[in-house]
A protein has these predicted regions:
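Juxtamembrane intracellular "pre-TM" segments in multi-pass secondary transporters
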Residues: 2-14, 190-223
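Short amphipathic helix-loop junctions that connect adjacent transmembrane helices
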Residues: 36-50, 236-252
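Residue-level signature of mid-helix packing/kink "hotspots" within the transmembrane helices
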Residues: 61-69, 151-152, 261-269
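Conserved MFS/SLC helix-loop-helix module at the cytosolic interface between two early adjacent transmembrane helices
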Residues: 66-102
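Helix-to-loop junctions at the C-terminal end of transmembrane segments
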Residues: 68-78, 266-280
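Cytoplasmic membrane-interface "Motif A"-like loop-to-helix N-cap segments
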Residues: 77-87, 276-289
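Cytoplasmic helix-loop-helix junction between adjacent transmembrane helices
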Residues: 109-148
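C-terminal membrane-cytosol helix-exit motif in multi-pass small-molecule transporters
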Residues: 176-195
């Protein structure tokens, strides 16, 4: 038995946070690896146009956004694990569909199906079930770090895998990562000793519409939406610009992304330290946007 008021995470909490962070990392790694390569390698697909390639890149977000809340509600009723298993299986099926596609429409269909495996809400809810309230922020920070790391790794590994195995091989690797995530859930994620119904979950369902209309949240959601739109648009335009304007072969794009990530990471550290010490993170954020 662990002390419910302990300042340290218990072994079970650490295991839960680490294993769920790993599940998130493998899923997001598979999702992110496609971004830097689809615009260039996707031109070989039948019917491919810049607009349809852009749709293929961002299509997963449509179904993911639509199903995130329903999957979370379903996980409250039938349990977190069945929803997570199902979501990862759907994600793997979408990757397999895209891997076997000969046309851009097949890839779009696969990406839409991938997005339908919207397990983020269920994973975060399971994390809440397995951690005490005072340690929840640390556990969620571990998941946030895993997502950031998976993005950085994907920018390098995605182009390298595609160069070696083609776009089809990349999607098969993505499917394998989803299945590996299912294995991690089966063998590493602790089981909750009892079904926990968080009071805040019930309140959130009752106040769903007022929450969606909240002005502060609307501004936050709009800002995040614009940020993601710019990111997706960048991966439509930048790879093609590197080929057409920069004369850089698509097989060599990985080192451009690696260099940009390293410069961005080490360049931001002093500003983050400054913002934390001077309590001017808003100013730092605005400067980063500019």
């Amino acid at each position: 038995m662990h002390d419910p008021h302990s300042d340290r995470m218990s072994a079970g909490e650490t295991r839960a946070a680490a294993s769920l962070a790993l599940v998130f990392a493998f899923r997001m790694l598979g999702m992110f690896m496609v971004l830097p390569v689809l615009a260039t390698y996707g031109t070989d697909l039948a019917g491919a146009t810049p607009a349809l390639i852009g749709l293929a890149i961002g299509a997963y977000g449509l179904t993911q956004a639509a199903l995130q809340i329903p999957f979370g509600v379903i996980s409250d009723r039938i349990g977190r694990l069945p929803v997570i298993y199902f979501g990862l299986l759907v994600f793997a099926a979408g990757a397999a569909l895209a891997a076997n596609a000969d046309s851009i429409w097949g890839v779009i269909a696969g990406r839409v199906l991938q997005g339908a495996g919207a397990i983020s809400a269920a994973v975060m809810a399971l994390l809440s079930d397995l951690t005490r309230e005072q340690h929840r922020t640390k556990a969620m920070a571990m998941i946030g770090m895993s997502i950031g790391l998976s993005f950085a790794v994907a920018m390098v590994v995605g182009p390298l895998l595609t160069r070696a195995f083609g776009l089809s091989g990349l999607f098969w690797a993505t499917a394998g990562m989803a299945l590996l995530g299912m294995l991690i859930v089966a063998v590493a994620v602790p089981r909750a000793s009892r079904s926990l119904q968080h009071r805040e979950s019930g309140v959130a369902r009752q106040a769903l519409l007022p929450t969606l209309r909240n002005g502060e949240l609307l501004r936050l959601n709009l800002g995040i939406g614009v940020l993601h739109a710019i990111l997706m648009a960048s991966f439509v335009a930048l790879p093609l610009a590197l080929v057409d304007e920069g004369g850089l072969a698509k097989e060599e794009h990985w080192w451009v992304y690696l260099s940009a990530l390293l410069i961005g990471f080490f360049g931001m550290v002093p500003f983050i330290i400054y913002g934390e010490k001077k309590r001017r993170m808003k100013r730092v954020l605005c400067g980063a946007v500019l």
